[in-house]
Curated annotation (Swiss-Prot):
Residues reported to bind ATP: 119-126
ClpX-type ZB domain span: 3-56
Record's keyword annotation contains Zinc: yes
Subunit text: Component of the ClpX-ClpP complex. Forms a hexameric ring that, in the presence of ATP, binds to fourteen ClpP subunits assembled into a disk-like structure with a central cavity, resembling the structure of eukaryotic proteasomes.
Gene this protein is translated from: clpX
Protein name (database record): ATP-dependent Clp protease ATP-binding subunit ClpX
Length: 422
């Protein structure tokens, strides 16, 4: 049994694994002959989670089932069940195709790239990142607004493949099975329904440049990037088995879809329905290729993205869940940060709802939650390293609204008091 037997601390108990005393940890669990602290229990749980994740990835010839993929996505992404279902099936089929070969009895299995349509901050990027972790393949992101056709100033589309190769630590075979997420593809729509007379190198031109690498080609990739080193040896990367996921907010697409669904007749046969009361997410779910064409994507580009998953706006309830429920939830991250100072960070329910309401007002979705949290916790994070005796900090609705300072609870008095300088 881990006990000290000298001086005043003869009755002090210690963790049998890390050696910390009962005063240095929050909980110390006693067994028949040993003790284990809460920190070691958490470490054990992390190890078990990693083992479970490895087991998932190795199931069924290395291809997890759609249900398994969906379950892991649920751990990290709140809501968006329809999108997660579509993605789970698409990713499962893609890597099953690679595991069993693309050709069998003269039947060639074509690649199905994915288009994610949804407002800013609804989880598009997080979904793509989590999928790459589940399958355990290299992953890279690119911003479509920074791309241009080869030969023009800005970034060549081939640099996307270079980034993927770097993510794979220059292992070409691994890179050729990776996932590429291209964000803001709605920003490279052409400026009108008719083909432009002048060269559109950052809109339609980028769509044209992306076509070949998305469908499958052998790309010549400069290891040092760009074309400034003409003597360098180019790497040949086959993009046929790289899964491309494109995402964008597509602001205004819902209006195009709704307009298509409206009747144009007059008289007795007229469509007399009132304004569409459905949510934006429900309308987007009815998207058709013709709607994307009207929005400004070229037919060939639409054809390279046969799987379309639509995401909905996040409401206040969903944002509160995003703050608290996922394994890497923001509240958990900041609580861990404060634990490093031996301080417990607590949020009231109305504080969480107010934070979520602020994010909705800013129209930033889940992406805006971190900046709000940083603003709220700036003073405590500044003061805490120089203070002693603080046991916990409470954030309530008034703190989020800027009408009060966070409440500090001191260990010796166990009474609430405002932050220093309040």
């Amino acid at each position: 049994m881990s006990k000290s037997s000298s001086g005043d601390s003869k009755n002090t108990l210690y963790c049998s694994f890390c050696g910390k005393s009962q005063h240095e940890v929050r909980k110390l669990i006693a067994g028949p002959t040993v003790f284990i602290c809460d920190e070691c229990v958490e470490l054990c749980m992390d190890i078990i989670r990693e083992e479970n994740k490895t087991t998932l990835v190795k199931s069924r010839d290395g291809v997890p089932t759609p249900r398994d993929i969906h379950a892991v996505l649920d751990d990290y992404v709140i809501g968006q069940h329809h999108a997660k279902r579509v993605l789970s099936v698409a990713v499962h089929n893609h890597y099953k195709r690679l595991a069993h070969g693309t050709k069998h009895n003269d039947v060639e299995l074509a690649k199905s790239n994915i288009l994610l349509v949804g407002p800013t901050g609804c989880g598009k990027t997080l979904l793509a990142q989590t999928l790459a972790r589940i399958i355990d393949v290299p992953f890279t992101m690119a911003d479509a607004t920074t791309l241009t056709e080869a030969g023009y100033v800005r970034e060549d589309v081939e640099n996307i493949i270079l980034k993927l190769l770097q993510a794979a630590r220059l292992q070409r075979r691994a890179a050729q099975r990776g996932i590429v997420y291209i964000d803001e593809v709605d920003k490279i729509s052409r400026k009108s329904d008719n083909p432009s007379i002048t060269r559109d190198v950052s809109g339609e031109g980028v769509q044209q440049a992306l076509l070949k690498i998305m469908e499958g080609t052998v790309a010549s990739v400069p290891p040092q990037g760009g074309r400034k080193h003409p003597q360098q040896e180019f790497l040949q990367v086959d993009t046929s088995n790289i899964l491309f996921i494109c995402g964008g907010a597509f602001a205004g697409l819902d209006k195009i879809i709704a307009q298509r669904g409206k009747g144009t007749s007059i008289g007795f046969g007229a469509d007399v329905r009132g304004p569409d009361e459905r949510s934006t997410g429900d309308i987007l779910r009815e998207v058709e290729p013709e709607d994307l064409l009207k929005f400004g994507l070229i037919p060939e580009f639409i054809g390279r993205l046969p799987v379309v998953a639509t995401l909905s706006d996040l409401d206040e309830t969903a944002l509160v869940e995003i703050l608290t429920k996922p394994k890497n939830a923001l509240v958990k991250q900041y609580q861990r940060l404060f634990e490093m100072e031996d301080v417990r960070l607590e949020f009231s329910d109305d504080a969480l709802r107010t934070i979520s309401h602020k994010a909705i007002q800013r129209k930033t979705g889940a992406r805006g939650l971190r900046s709000i949290m940083e603003s709220i916790l700036l003073d405590p994070m500044f003061d805490l390293p120089g203070l002693s005796g603080v046991e916990s900090i409470l954030v309530n609705k008034e703190v989020v609204e800027g009408r009060a300072k966070p409440l500090y609870v001191h260990a010796e008095r166990r009474g609430e008091q405002q932050a220093p300088g309040a």
